[in-house]
Amino acid sequence: MWRFFYTSLLLICQPLILCFIGLLSVKSPRYRQRLAERYGFYGNASCPPPQGIFIHAASVGEVIAATPLVRQLQQDYPHLSITFTTFTPTGSERVKATFGDSVFHYYLPLDLPFSIHRFINFVQPKLCIVMETELWPNLIHQLFLRNIPFVIANARLSARSAHRYGKIKAHLQTMWSQISLIAAQDNISGKRYATLGYPKEKLNITGNIKYDLNTNDELLRKIDSLRTLWKQDRPIWIAASTHNGEDEIILKSHRALLAKYPNLLLLLVPRHPERFNVVADLLKKEKFQFIRRSTNELPNENTQVILGDSMGELMLMYGISDIAFVGGSLVKHGGHNPLEPLAFKMPVITGKHTFNFPEIFRMLVEVQGVLEVNSTADALERAVEALLNSKESRERLGNAGYEVLMENRGALQRLLDLLKPYLERNV
C-alpha cells in the first residue's frame, strides 16, 4: 500500500519534475538531452548483452567510488557486460571519461513502474549493484519479482537520511525484505540501517572501497609529464571539488599568499562542470592571471591560477600538487573524499563540515592525518602557509594520512567475496 501512495505521488509530481529538469537545463543544457531515457525509452541505442551486471551511481562522487569495483569486475568477469547508469550529466561524462566504450551507459529512469519495466526489459541484468545511498522502491520491487538480486555496495546513510527514513520505518519492511545485501562502508551507517529494520543477517560491514585506490603506472607517467610542463620549480596547492561559496574564500587566501610567495600556483577545480564558467568569471573579476586546463595552454611565470575545467583528471591534478585542500567542507555540503590526495602522501587541509565521511575523518583527525580549518580566508591562508614553510610538517601530515589509507585497504576484496555467489549463479 505504501508503494502505491509513493508511486501515485511520483506520478502527480511529474509536471514539477519536468519543470525542475527544465530549470536545471538553463544552467546546464545537457539536462535537456536524452530526456526519453528518464522514462525508459532508448530509441536506437545499443542494448547490452543479457545477464550482465547493472551498476547505478547517481553522480560523480558515486562514479568515483564505483571505479575500483568496476575495474576489478571487468578483470574477474570479462564475459559479463557492465551497464552503468547515472542520474546527472556530470556523472555520465565521468563514466565516459573513465571507461569509454568498455561499459554501456544510460540514465536510470525515474522510479515509475512503467519506466523501470522498460529499462529492465532493455538491460536484462543478472545482478543490480547500487552505490552508496540510492533506495528506489519500484526498481527494487520489479527486480525482486524477476529474481534479480539488488545489492547496495559501499553503503552509507547520513544522520539526516536516517532521520527521514525513520519517519516511515513501519512502511520500509517490505522493501528491506527485497534487498539481497547491504555492504556498509562503516559501522555508523551499518547501525543506522539496522535501526531502520534491515535484517542483520543480510547486513555486512565491508569498509569503504574508496581506500582501495590504485595509482597505476599510466597515471604516474602522466603526472611526471605534466609536472615537467607545469611546475617549473614552483610550489603548487590545489583546491579540489569546490562548491559555491568556497571559491571566494580560496581566492582571497591565495591573494594573500601570493604577497609572500609570488611564484605560488593554485589549481582550482570546481566540483561541477556547470560552475566552470562561473568560476572563470570570478577569476576575471578578481583580476587573477589564469589559464583553463581545457585549452591545454601551458602556464608561464605570470600565471597565478589554473582552472581545472576538465573531466576525469582530478587524480592527475592531485599528483602534481604539493598541498591539497578538499572542498565541500568550508560550506555545509559535507565534504568530499580526502583519500585521493592521501594516495600521494600529500598533506590535506579541510574545513569543519565533513559529515559525508564521518568515519574517514574521525580516523584522520585521531592520527593528525588531516588539518581542519575554520571557514575563513585567514584560517585557510595560515594553514597553507604553515605547510609551505615546513617540509617536515608536510611529510608528517601526509604520512599520517597515508597510513590510515593503507591500514583500511581490503574493502574491495571483501565486497567482491560477497558478490561472488550472485555473479556466478546460473539463471
Swiss-Prot record:
Which sites bind CMP?
270-271, 311-313, 337-340
Q: Domain of life, per the record?
A: Bacteria
InterPro entries membership: Glyco_trans_1, Glycos_transf_N, Glycos_transf_N_sf, Kdotransferase
Query: What coarse category fits the chief subcellular location reported for this protein?
Result: membrane
Catalytic activity line of the entry: lipid IVA (E. coli) + CMP-3-deoxy-beta-D-manno-octulosonate = alpha-Kdo-(2->6)-lipid IVA (E. coli) + CMP + H(+)
Question: Annotated site (Transition state stabilizer), which positions?
Answer: 132, 210
What keywords tag this UniProt record?
Cell inner membrane, Cell membrane, Lipopolysaccharide biosynthesis, Membrane, Signal-anchor, Transferase, Transmembrane, Transmembrane helix
Q: Give the record's pathway.
A: Bacterial outer membrane biogenesis; LPS core biosynthesis
The listed locations are: Cell inner membrane
What EC designation does it have? 2.4.99.12
**In what way does activity depend on pH?**
Optimum pH is 7.5.
**For this chain's UniProt record, which GO biological process terms are given?**
lipid A biosynthetic process; lipopolysaccharide core region biosynthetic process
Q: Which GO molecular function annotation, any one, does this entry have?
A: transferase activity
Task: Say if the entry is tagged with keyword Transmembrane.
Answer: yes
* Bilayer topology annotation: Single-pass membrane protein
| Top-rank EC class of the record's enzyme | transferase
Keyword Lyase included in the entry's annotation = no
Q: Where is the active site?
A: 62 (proton acceptor)
| A GO-annotated cellular component | plasma membrane
PANTHER family recorded: 3-DEOXY-D-MANNO-OCTULOSONIC ACID TRANSFERASE, MITOCHONDRIAL-RELATED, 3-DEOXY-MANNO-OCTULOSONATE CYTIDYLYLTRANSFERASE
Q: Which family does it belong to?
A: Belongs to the glycosyltransferase group 1 family. Glycosyltransferase 30 subfamily.
User: What is the protein named?
Assistant: 3-deoxy-D-manno-octulosonic acid transferase
Q: Which organism is it from?
A: Haemophilus influenzae (strain ATCC 51907 / DSM 11121 / KW20 / Rd)
The lineage is:
Bacteria, Pseudomonadati, Pseudomonadota, Gammaproteobacteria, Pasteurellales
